[in-house]
Amino acid sequence: MAIRGKSYIKTSWAFQERPVSSAKFNTWDDRIEAALELLMNLASLAWGGGDGVIRNASAGDLAVSARTPPGMAVSVAPGYAFIGRFPFRLSASTMVGGIASPVSHPRIDLVQARLDTWDVTVKQGTEATSPSAPEPDDDCLALAELYLRPGMTAVLDSDDGVNGYITDVRTYV
């Protein structure tokens, strides 16, 4: 298992090259990588060992909410999580746009935190008379489901019967 995500310093080297060609340095570097991986695994186990948001680690805990004024975008509050036993951090409130209303039937989209890029994306679901949410991608953590209706003009925090609304699906460690 290799260390993934932005929490690992080695990702700053574009092609995983090492600055020194010494075999001794390369062995030392591999031991540092193993130690960092062990440290991340132990930290994950200390928080419960699963994937999820770390409760009360920051003001927002990766909560998804409607924008002010409401529109076809949502905001995700900063927070910390573990995804695949690796730390994830969203340092500032982030606006996630690109949400399009369905054409003929309701649809459920998934707001997910992505480990490899430390950002938040929306995974589009499939339109259906009785829609279901898509599964999170690999190395992603589900934060919220967006129930979207045909002809809607905004995503709200609660159901008003006309527009789309947000359902919190965060899990905590």
Language-model features, listed with the residues they occupy:
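Beta-strand-rich solenoidal segments
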Residues: 2-173
